[in-house]
Amino acid sequence: MGLPWYRVHTVVLNDPGRLISVHIMHTALVAGWAGSMALYELAVFDPSDPVLDPMWRQGMFVIPFMTRLGITNSWGGWSITGGTVTDPGIWSYEGVAGSHIVFSGLCFLAAIWHWVYWDLEIFCDERTGKPSLDLPKIFGIHLFLSGVACFGFGAFHVTGLYGPGIWVSDPYGLTGKVQSVNPAWGVEGFDPFVPGGIASHHIAAGTLGILAGLFHLSVRPPQRLYKGLRMGNIETVLSSSIAAVFFAAFVVAGTMWYGSATTPIELFGPTRYQWDQGYFQQEIYRRVSAGLAENQSLSEAWSKIPEKLAFYDYIGNNPAKGGLFRAGSMDNGDGIAVGWLGHPIFRDKEGRELFVRRMPTFFETFPVVLIDGDGIVRADVPFRRAESKYSVEQVGVTVEFYGGELNGVSYSDPATVKKYARRAQLGEIFELDRATLKSDGVFRSSPRGWFTFGHASFALLFFFGHIWHGSRTLFRDVFAGIDPDLDSQVEFGAFQKLGDPTTRRQAV
């Protein structure tokens, strides 16, 4: 049977045993990739600085997902929070990776077994002796089992009743840790940033899935609905399964890109909207103002800003700054962050405090403009010095640092002032090591960006797949000349006109 490459899956169309086999093999590949990728990431991951070199700066992709579900320790003796551990237990990062690889191997063997022993009695219709699947019943079984898993995850794993809980943090990504979560049954449970909604929604969805599964196991579909939706055709299952997958992919692309309780910034990095809205900058200024209100000096107030919070307020951590096709981690772009230099405050010769206008997300270059508290331009770095009126030299701009490594240091020479004004466009100023990884200075995206791009792209592709296979199954008789009510097996290539027994080919 000579099939073109895009039609090879027809070999399992009327073969339930081998249909199971190829799905088990697919599971083996997925689990094997996950375990192998986890081991690779653990081999290259540096856990020494969770503040300035967290997992998302290093381009880790599967470690954040393990951490989000409650894994924090390694058999190497380190913890994701920066401490050391003596007894990580079996469910460490390596334990999870190993279990996926073992599971992959078992699935591989099961797939081979089902490929060899494909003609099982369980697949045969007692009345006809031909292979057939009771698809509505199988749907009910799968719905019931997935409902049990969903309910169990929400009621036991997330709540900590039997499990570790999940990663929970504050709105600014400073105090994250794994903890148990109580279900949120009120209106607050619909807030995407409330962790309690994860528990309550899994419990509710799981309960619904269990009830719906029992319904589909006990109630047969009406004949007209069965025929109208082609419920006896395996391609109907394919079409509706693809619909479920692309819908889920669109949802998680949104929760990842826009942020939610399921995608903490400590594990996946900040979102672009936090830069656009000055989210961390506002919190930093609020803390400094609160310190000044308590009679702290400007230097003391800025020195109490957590380095972690200052690091979030840096454009290099914005996932929208990296191009989609710039390979590598953020550390390979602008370098490994070594330390916060402090907050620069610029002043003109009249003593006015000046603020550098920050670079918007989608600019690669941006004019250096310094404005006062009223938004009036007071200084800039001109493109044409001959026509300048507000140059740093003319206005007499100076800069002084508060907090960080340069706390109390001031500069008045124009070249240095302009250097720090340019860097202040990018948010808080950090010392970056570009030598270690031979970083090229071009911003990269974080795993948040990669995940969103991948899932949005595949969701679109799978949407078209759903339309394609849904159309094929609904209009099979039109497209292929096969009667939709035809129950007999069709041997592809046996007839000149597919499904028409009067056009049987002659054996050569």
UniProtKB/Swiss-Prot annotation:
- Give a short account of what the protein does: One of the components of the core complex of photosystem II (PSII). It binds chlorophyll and helps catalyze the primary light-induced photochemical processes of PSII. PSII is a light-driven water:plastoquinone oxidoreductase, using light energy to abstract electrons from H(2)O, generating O(2) and a proton gradient subsequently used for ATP formation.
**Record note on cofactor:** Binds multiple chlorophylls. PSII binds additional chlorophylls, carotenoids and specific lipids.
Span of the signal peptide: none
Q: Which GO terms describe its biological process?
A: photosynthetic electron transport in photosystem II
State whether it acts alone or in a complex, and with which partners, per the record. PSII is composed of 1 copy each of membrane proteins PsbA, PsbB, PsbC, PsbD, PsbE, PsbF, PsbH, PsbI, PsbJ, PsbK, PsbL, PsbM, PsbT, PsbX, PsbY, PsbZ, Psb30/Ycf12, at least 3 peripheral proteins of the oxygen-evolving complex and a large number of cofactors. It forms dimeric complexes.
Q: Name one GO molecular function term.
A: electron transporter, transferring electrons within the cyclic electron transport pathway of photosynthesis activity
**What is its subcellular localisation?**
Plastid, Chloroplast thylakoid membrane
- Principal location: plastid
Q: Keywords of this protein's UniProt record, alphabetized? A: Chlorophyll, Chloroplast, Chromophore, Membrane, Photosynthesis, Photosystem II, Plastid, Thylakoid, Transmembrane, Transmembrane helix
Cross-referenced NCBIfam families, in alphabetical order?
Answer: PS_II_CP47
- State the organism of origin: Fagopyrum esculentum subsp. ancestrale (Wild buckwheat)
State the family named in the UniProt similarity comment for this chain: Belongs to the PsbB/PsbC family. PsbB subfamily.
Membrane topology field: Multi-pass membrane protein
Membrane-spanning residues? 21-36, 101-115, 140-156, 203-218, 237-252, 457-472
Superkingdom of the organism of origin: Eukaryota
From the Swiss-Prot or TrEMBL record, give the protein name. Answer: Photosystem II CP47 reaction center protein
Q: Name one GO cellular component term.
A: chloroplast thylakoid membrane
